[in-house]
Amino acid sequence: MASVALEDVAVNFTREEWALLGPCQKNLYKDVMQETIRNLDCVGMKWKDQNIEDQYRYPRKNLRCRMLERFVESKDGTQCGETSSQIQDSIVTKNTLPGVGPYESRMSGEVIMGHSSLNCYIRVGAGHKPYEYHECGEKPDTHKQRGKAFSYHNSLQTHERLHTGKKPYNCKECGKSFSSLGNLQRHMAVQRGDGPYKCKLCGKAFFWPSLLHMHERTHTGEKPYECKQCSKAFSFYSSYLRHERTHTGEKLYECKQCSKAFPDYSSCLRHERTHTGKKPYTCKQCGKAFSASTSLRRHETTHTDEKPYACQQCGKAFHHLGSFQRHMVMHTRDGPHKCKICGKGFDCPSSLKSHERTHTGEKLYECKQCGKALSHSSSFRRHMTMHTGDGPHKCKICGKAFVYPSVFQRHEKTHTAEKPYKCKQCGKAYRISSSLRRHETTHTGEKPYKCKCGKAFIDFYSFQNHKTTHAGEKPYECKECGKAFSCFQYLSQHRRTHTGEKPYECNTCKKAFSHFGNLKVHERIHSGEKPYECKECGKAFSWLTCFLRHERIHMREKPYECQQCGKAFTHSRFLQGHEKTHTGENPYECKECGKAFASLSSLHRHKKTHWKKTHTGENPYGCKECGKAFASLSSLHRHKKTH
């Protein structure tokens, strides 16, 4: 029923070994292999005609004698046992190649490298597999195969690593780990650029067409593996299997310290490093260490100008495939799954369903603590951490917890002075790469995200927040004063006006702020930096909002109109302050004298003129020309005009 294929009885030379063979030895090897093919054909085996020299010039594994555990059907239904007896009977002692080995098969013509290799040869021919992995048999619900068996002990060891997750072979170049020597060798060949199969887009080389085909999916976006439950598609089978576990809830790997379970070993290993603090992957250029190899590779691109993923429509290039794919969606929206309402296209049905909720307003996930409903499970999980504060990544300095390690790492930098991301044009440094990218747009003037009203934005998040001003939707309401906000971040920032919390402190003057953005702007007072310059009149500004307000003076643009009296304003805050003149609302009260104000900025100005001047006599704003001091910045500005 099953018998030996050509690859099961073939001798594989390494690249170095093949180069050492002389012309006579190579010809002899070809003759032996051709005789093997003829013998297999005679006994009814299926085989593929291949160029033998090409096949062994690029060996599949760097082993002297490799016996595959793969069997093919016999043409005439020959029993496996009969074939094995033929093979065993045909073994004779014969020294054909000096120094190679005394055993040769008459049937196949294969030179066997010693007695242990001969035993291996017989095992493969007979289908004998003495090494069995019992874990597969003990867990029939987890594994489809029961008691999987192998012909060689090293094959058993390689298989066991699938269960243990052990990866003993490390790449010295990038630190990536592998479960088998063959996988490491293949990886190193890709790093060296070896292999006959080259990618036409990025030049990466591969030994096998199958690996090249898999790699090409990273460029084409092809996703052949689709989940039957939710229709989500994946480029690689391993990613598809990991995803399936999210539906079954299967979590095989448990953290020894906190007992948290994970669907795959690599996730468990990354999680364990949050307990140990281990960061085995170090950047050779700046010495920065990372807990995951993917984080290191992402970081390394910040040192180079390499951006391998280029958009063919606008020419914009990206360091990472994920960023490139997100960018392409903004251009095309031409996926096969189209929205019937707005015509947008999506790659998979699950993305379309998620998008359709933005039209229907359907919110499947409701928070039991505050009653808030959300459209997506990911948004719901993020929201829940606001209540519990039980994210796995906790800050040792302030105790704040985070769900995602990337967000946690960004937060850690707020406590340190570390700023690894530098602008090449002006030398300004930033804690996170996204801040650097935003800053770089101040030099280029690029605003890729455009609203239908004509307004353009530097980043997608600001663009999304702006769109809510048109919709008028403000689902996030403050329980203290009833004020509503279009996004949760604005509500969180607003809450600090009631609690008085100021977690961000200036290292120069120790002044504290409730928002990180305010701290950044304040620091410009010390540095004198004014990155936003008007192209019309050359006036420079420390704040982007001030710069945008100033620009509207030239354009005479007033997009914010009062619905009661029709008065228009250049900024939404001015409109909000104006609207309170109609309602008479003064929600901001001075704790010192009880005076109430319509806007928070008015209260702050009052505190400086009333509280500081009356109670302390402090006038913090001094004129550099004459030395006169003022209680408020606006008074100083007015005074400066006299000079």
Swiss-Prot record:
PROSITE patterns: KRAB, ZINC_FINGER_C2H2_1, ZINC_FINGER_C2H2_2. It is found in: Nucleus. Transmembrane segments: none annotated. Keywords: DNA-binding, Metal-binding, Nucleus, Repeat, Transcription, Transcription regulation, Zinc, Zinc-finger. One of its GO terms (cellular component) is nucleus. Residues 4-86 form the KRAB domain. Gene3D superfamilies: 6.10.140.140, Classic Zinc Finger (3.30.160.60). A zinc finger (C2H2-type) spans 134-163, 169-191, 197-219, 225-247, 253-275, 281-303, 309-331, 337-359, 365-387, 393-415, 421-443, 449-470, 476-498, 504-526, 532-554, 560-582, 588-615, 621-643. One of its GO terms (biological process) is regulation of transcription by RNA polymerase II. Coiled coil: none annotated. Its main location: nucleus. One of its GO terms (molecular function) is DNA-binding transcription factor activity, RNA polymerase II-specific. SMART domains: KRAB, ZnF_C2H2. May be involved in transcriptional regulation. Belongs to the krueppel C2H2-type zinc-finger protein family. This is Zinc finger protein 799.
